[in-house]
Amino acid sequence: MATLGVNIDHIANVRQARKTVEPDPVQFAFLAELGGADSITVHLREDRRHIQDRDVFLLKETIKTKLNLEMAATEEMLEIAKKTLPDYVTLVPEKREEVTTEGGLDLKSNAQYLKNFVENLKHSNIEVSAFIDPLGEQINYSKEIGFDFIELHTGKYAELSGSEQYKELQRIIESTHLANDLGLVVNAGHGLNYNNVKKIASINNMNELNIGHSIVARALAIGLEKSVREMKSLITSN
């Protein structure tokens, strides 16, 4: 049965819109855990557009579940991860001009650099995941580089409908099976919401789904704890 990782970046987005101290994502992480979140995900971007360094450190000290730190593979982020010691790190591509992460890492073109980067994190006993598109080549490189997990990018699945969405779902299923055969733990995320999550959650050996925007959007209407409970129920009711 898949677990639920709640991404709280959008709480920080609201705070940073006014450059003030509220809403505090650390407080909302606590509410997400009350609602059943199995882990908390934050993306510390190089431009600090939402999550700030203090958020990461405070979350590590206060949350009761696990902390998943999404970050680019840079020396600055490596040092922050080694100081913070999150439960695991998910390496993601990053462009300053993007609104949100647009696609998976290209592991092939950065294989040696990423291998050294992953080894460095593992020396600090941090497990490492790669955010990748559901492609066989990228999954094979994930194993070769030494990642413990992969997170399959579900953005395309979320954007499509009908037969095209079905084809993308099959690609995600096949990618999950390939990764499992290679000994990789499989997470998934991006664009998942209350209407499309169940088919992804029902994939055999899917470990965790990382979801943020749809939960936060629904929380504006019904409250965060309840919105997390509803998503958790959808994931676990297979």
Curated annotation (Swiss-Prot):
Residues at the catalytic site: H43, E70, H190
Catalytic activity: 3-amino-2-oxopropyl phosphate + 1-deoxy-D-xylulose 5-phosphate = pyridoxine 5'-phosphate + phosphate + 2 H2O + H(+)
Subcellular location: Cytoplasm
Transition state stabilizer (site feature) positions: E151
Gene Ontology cellular-component annotations: cytosol
Binding-site residues for 3-amino-2-oxopropyl phosphate, renumbered to this chain: N7, R18, G191, G212, H213
Keywords assigned: Cytoplasm, Pyridoxine biosynthesis, Transferase
EC number(s) from the headed UniProt entry: 2.6.99.2
InterPro entries hit by this protein: Aldolase_TIM, PyrdxlP_synth_PdxJ, Pyridoxine-5'_phos_synth
Pathway: Cofactor biosynthesis; pyridoxine 5'-phosphate biosynthesis; pyridoxine 5'-phosphate from D-erythrose 4-phosphate: step 5/5
Coiled-coil residue spans: none
GO MF terms held by the record: pyridoxine 5'-phosphate synthase activity
Domain of life: Bacteria
Role this protein plays: Catalyzes the complicated ring closure reaction between the two acyclic compounds 1-deoxy-D-xylulose-5-phosphate (DXP) and 3-amino-2-oxopropyl phosphate (1-amino-acetone-3-phosphate or AAP) to form pyridoxine 5'-phosphate (PNP) and inorganic phosphate.
PANTHER family reported in the protein's UniProt record: PYRIDOXINE 5'-PHOSPHATE SYNTHASE
HAMAP family assigned to the protein according to its UniProt record, in alphabetical order: PdxJ
Entry protein name: Pyridoxine 5'-phosphate synthase
Native source species: Prochlorococcus marinus (strain MIT 9312)
